[in-house]
Amino acid sequence: MSVYTSVSDDEMRGFLSGYDLGEFVSLQGIAQGITNSNYFLTTTSGRYVLTVFEVLKQEELPFFLELNRHLSMKGVAVAAPVARKDGRLDSVLAGKPACLVACLKGSDTALPTAEQCFHTGAMLAKMHLAAADFPLEMENPRYDAWWTEACARLLPVLSQDDAALLRAEIDALKDNLGNHLPSGIIHADLFKDNVLLDGGQVSGFIDFYYACRGNFMYDLAIAVNDWARTADNKLDEALKKAFIGGYEGVRPLSAEEKAYFPTAQRAGCIRFWVSRLLDFHFPQAGEMTFIKDPNAFRNLLLSLG
């Protein structure tokens, strides 16, 4: 999360007039993350997370917010959206789309245990199953067409080796995207900083704003690539096993899915290597922003062999 759009106290008071959340107390920017402007909002009725969307359009928000409400009602640990007085889940602040969600207890972790990986994997499988009857649709905006287009933009600024690696991996994935595998609504960004933990248990998944339709192996691979990734950008096999074991305890994988998993891991590496390269070479101006190391997923990709 980051802060690109600054919000004054007076703007917040006007914004809150559309909600039954009491009086404004304070607003604190959240520096982590890279896409939207995020704040902790405190009112006389409690604490919430405010998100001002820098890229998503107003008409796209209902998918993400209704998905969170749907999952919350199905017992998945998520940050439920807060409705306005008029019943809408989305709003406008500083001329941009915005929303409020519940502020969950717990915190993220940079060094997960096997127990935390197991329970996070189980909750991811529960999420996949719970979203099976969700009626709204969203295609993946950051999949093959996106990374192919981004590659063309990035090649002039990359080293010769990185450019060759990126081209080769994207070419290899063209006819191997796993579209034949079980699919549904996926989180598509379930990194460690998007899961709140209370001890060994999951208190909530957050930041669903890349959620879309996709194959479940791709979603699982994205999560494992981060949760089991070590400081030197290799995979800890014990953490990987724990995460997948938790997932399979809720939703067993087919032999075909297991066979595809290594390819899904490579696709996950490409997706986040490309997005971080774009953020690094073409940064978005902001008051309090956080750009992540683009080489982490290149190095993980290389370690996969």
UniProtKB/Swiss-Prot annotation:
Superkingdom: Bacteria
Involved pathway(s)? Amino-acid biosynthesis; L-threonine biosynthesis; L-threonine from L-aspartate: step 4/5
Q: What class of enzyme is it?
A: transferase
Gene3D superfamilies, per the entry: 3.90.1200.10, Phosphorylase Kinase, domain 1
Task: Give GO MF terms, alphabetically.
Answer: ATP binding; homoserine kinase activity
Q: What is its EC number?
A: 2.7.1.39
GO biological process assignments: threonine biosynthetic process
- One of the Pfam families matching this protein, by short name: APH
Keyword line? Amino-acid biosynthesis, ATP-binding, Kinase, Nucleotide-binding, Threonine biosynthesis, Transferase
What reaction does this catalyse? L-homoserine + ATP = O-phospho-L-homoserine + ADP + H(+)
UniProt record similarity statement? Belongs to the pseudomonas-type ThrB family.
Q: Which PANTHER family does this chain map to?
A: AMINOGLYCOSIDE PHOSPHOTRANSFERASE DOMAIN-CONTAINING PROTEIN (PTHR21064:SF6), AMINOGLYCOSIDE PHOSPHOTRANSFERASE DOMAIN-CONTAINING PROTEIN-RELATED (PTHR21064)
Designated name of the protein: Homoserine kinase
The major lineage groups are: Bacteria, Pseudomonadati, Pseudomonadota, Betaproteobacteria, Neisseriales
